[in-house]
Regions:
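Alpha-helical transmembrane segments of compact multi-pass small-molecule transporters, enriched
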Residues: 60-64, 113-127, 142-143, 198-203, ...
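Membrane-interface interhelical linkers
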Residues: 1-33, 62-86, 135, 185, ...
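C-terminal-most transmembrane helix of multi-pass membrane proteins
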Residues: 2-5, 254, 258-300
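Helix-helix packing/entry segments at the starts of transmembrane helices
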Residues: 111-116, 183-198, 234-265
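Hydrophobic transmembrane alpha-helices of multi-pass small-molecule transport proteins
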Residues: 136-152, 173, 275-294
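Glycine-/small-residue-enriched transmembrane alpha-helix faces in small-molecule transporters
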Residues: 1-52, 157-182, 299-300
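C-terminal transmembrane-helix exit sites in multi-pass transporters
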Residues: 69-73, 100, 117-139, 258-277
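Specific transmembrane alpha-helical segments of multi-pass solute transporters/efflux pumps
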Residues: 37, 73-109, 114, 150, ...
Length: 300
């Protein structure tokens, strides 16, 4: 009887784990679509300074998060304020660089290079967390960079400045996502989102001082859409990281590249060329071979 109870408890735990993983996957899919819509909204308003986009996005996020925090009570009180501030700083840096990349690159290309985030996260783990950086991870990083070079070298519409901003986005996001993964152990998801928005407000205001202009007409609509989709993406991403391993969440997030390429077609990017597709394929392959080692080690 004790043995049967033990098996029953084990089955229930396994079922709950599968359900949690399924919920996490759904959250990540919604996050990927939200971020693709955010990128499309940003691309539709090229005349609005990018620091202004970050400011208005953060202002909308503060209002929406305050409404969502109603009822969270003491759970929303920050436990690690300094770590929250660092996560917010790198999140701000990554978001600003992302908007700069979107202005200079086809939408699908910018999102593809951004998805090198986990490769940079692995390198950061070696440098700052004393994690082993194996040969397969070095290979995956080189293959990924090769994919970026292929996209740039054979695509005349892709500039090195745009590629640089996209790589900066991936690097800053790697730091921010690593901190989010740690913060979700003690912080309410909305607390993490609120900290990001609150810190981004003064940073974007200072960074864009003197270059601001009043949005006109439909620019207000796209700025509002940018704020709402970024908010939904941040909330869904934070919830996904509560249920999924970072590597699994990143793998599901690759769907965002497909969303971005499809959205980019009516925005004037056209159908992706062979160079872009081949470069994207190399980047995806690099992420796959880099993840294989992590999967093998986690199963031991």
């Amino acid at each position: 009887l004790r043995h049967l109870n033990s098996e029953s408890s084990h089955d229930r735990a396994a079922q709950e784990e599968r359900l949690a993983a399924r919920r996490g996957a759904i959250w990540m899919l919604v996050a990927a679509f939200s971020f693709a819509c955010m990128a499309a909204s940003a691309k539709l308003i090229p005349e609005v300074p990018n620091t202004e986009k970050v400011f208005i996005r953060s202002l909308i996020s503060v209002v929406l998060t305050l409404l969502m925090l109603h009822g969270a009570g003491s759970r929303a009180i920050p436990k690690r304020p300094w770590m929250l501030m660092w996560r917010a700083f790198f999140g701000f840096l990554g978001l600003w660089a992302y908007f700069e990349a979107i202005d200079r690159l086809p939408l699908g290309t910018a999102v593809t290079i951004y998805n090198m985030t986990p490769l940079f996260a692995a390198a950061l783990g070696m440098l700052f967390l004393s994690e082993r950086f194996r040969a397969i991870q070095i290979l995956s990083l080189l293959v990924g960079l090769g994919g970026v070079a292929l996209i740039k070298g054979l695509s005349p519409e892709v500039t090195w400045v745009g590629v640089g901003f996209a790589l900066c986005t991936a690097f800053a996001s790697a730091i921010a996502y690593t901190l989010v993964r740690v913060l979700t152990r003690t912080e309410h998801p909305l607390t993490i989102v609120m900290a990001f928005a609150v810190v981004s407000l003064p940073l974007s205001l200072l960074a864009g001082w003197g270059s601001w202009r009043m949005p006109e007409g439909m620019e207000w609509v796209w700025l509002f859409a940018l704020g709402v989709t970024t908010q939904s993406g941040q909330v869904c991403l934070t919830k996904a990281l509560q249920s999924l391993r970072a590597s699994r969440a990143t793998q599901i997030g690759f769907v965002g590249v497909i969303f971005a390429m499809l959205l980019g077609i009516p925005l004037g990017d056209g159908i992706p060329g062979m160079a872009q597709l081949a470069g994207a394929g190399l980047i995806f392959w690099s992420l796959h071979i880099g993840r294989q080692r992590v999967t093998k080690e986690s199963s031991r």
